[in-house]
């Protein structure tokens, strides 16, 4: 039972770190290679 409670306490932490990394990666990709939604000629 302690292994299950340890899993419940660490899975949200791992998910938070993963989602933060993914969001930061997408933000940096869009900063250097912006989407062609707005064409500023």
UniProtKB/Swiss-Prot annotation:
<protein>
    <recommendedName>
        <fullName>Photosystem I reaction center subunit IX</fullName>
    </recommendedName>
</protein>
<dbReference type="GO" id="GO:0009522">
    <property type="term" value="C:photosystem I"/>
</dbReference>
<dbReference type="GO" id="GO:0009535">
    <property type="term" value="C:chloroplast thylakoid membrane"/>
</dbReference>
<keyword id="KW-1133">Transmembrane helix</keyword>
<keyword id="KW-0603">Photosystem I</keyword>
<keyword id="KW-0150">Chloroplast</keyword>
<keyword id="KW-0812">Transmembrane</keyword>
<dbReference type="Pfam" id="PF01701">
    <property type="entry name" value="PSI_PsaJ"/>
</dbReference>
<keyword id="KW-0602">Photosynthesis</keyword>
<comment type="similarity">
    <text>Belongs to the PsaJ family.</text>
</comment>
<dbReference type="InterPro" id="IPR036062">
    <property type="entry name" value="PSI_PsaJ_sf"/>
</dbReference>
<comment type="function">
    <text>May help in the organization of the PsaE and PsaF subunits.</text>
</comment>
<dbReference type="InterPro" id="IPR002615">
    <property type="entry name" value="PSI_PsaJ"/>
</dbReference>
<dbReference type="GO" id="GO:0015979">
    <property type="term" value="P:photosynthesis"/>
</dbReference>
<keyword id="KW-0934">Plastid</keyword>
<feature type="transmembrane region" description="Helical">
    <location>
        <begin position="7"/>
        <end position="27"/>
    </location>
</feature>
<keyword id="KW-0472">Membrane</keyword>
<keyword id="KW-0793">Thylakoid</keyword>
């Amino acid at each position: 039972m302690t292994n299950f409670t340890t899993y419940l306490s660490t899975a949200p932490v791992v998910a938070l770190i993963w989602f933060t990394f993914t969001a930061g990666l997408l933000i940096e990709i869009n900063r250097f290679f912006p989407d062609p939604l707005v064409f500023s000629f």
